[in-house]
Amino acid sequence: MVGIMKKKIILSACVALAMAFSLPSQAQRLIPKQRGIEVVGSVPLIKGEKFLAADNFGMGASLTHYLGRENYTFVMAEYEQQNMPYRSYNVKLKDALLQMGYMHPVLSDNGKNVFLYGGISALGGYEQLNEDKKLLPDGATLLDRSHFVYGGVVHGSAEVFLTDRVLFLVKAQGRFLFGTDVHRFRPAVSAGLRFNF
């Protein structure tokens, strides 16, 4: 009888423990002053190019800081590389950018597991064109130059809580760059993870 009772107590404790870890505890989500680290990979959307063209990619890391009512600010360091076709040669365009911005919730489910955000940010950085080489392989001179760039970004984001502290993100952004000699508007899509602490 005592052996059966021990087994039932152990089984009940295991079930209670499993339930505690499997049920979301939303009290720990989106707390004001909560911070997070975000890592994303991105793909630039280039008119006339395949969606996942070789050597067209980006990556970024950001720090987030939650304010009240599920909104947050962020600072992001980002690198993006694109190939611009010229005859049989690809001219490399590389951007190293720093963004500072604000995201505001637009829509969420009742359980606060899925959020849609809209936001804006300011950016600045350096754009390198063809590794600063002025001559192309066919002898043509590249008139566009490397520059410091600045501008603004509009963001859209879908964020899903995988656990109370880990989110899966899918983002779209449209960058408006000034100071550049090529493509002032640069859309991109990205996906990644955020770890809140």
Where are these regions (language model features)?
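Short glycine/proline- and aromatic-enriched beta-strand/turn motifs that initiate or cap beta-hairpins
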Residues: Q26-M76, R194-N196
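Cleavable N-terminal export/targeting peptides
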Residues: M1-K33
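Short, positively charged, low-complexity/disordered linker segments
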Residues: L136-T163
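Residues that define the transmembrane beta-barrel architecture of outer-membrane proteins
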Residues: K33-R35, A53-M59, K92-L98, V114, ...
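Predominantly the C-terminal beta-signal and adjacent terminal strand-loop region
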Residues: E80-N83, S157-F197
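Extracellular loop and loop/strand-boundary signature of outer-membrane beta-barrel proteins
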Residues: I46-E49, M84-V91, D138-D144, R175-T180
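Gram-negative (and chloroplast) outer-membrane scaffold detector with strong preference
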Residues: S62-P137, V166, F195-F197
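Residues on the lipid-exposed face of transmembrane beta-strands in outer-membrane beta-barrel proteins
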Residues: V39-G41, M59-H65, L98-H104, I120-G124, ...
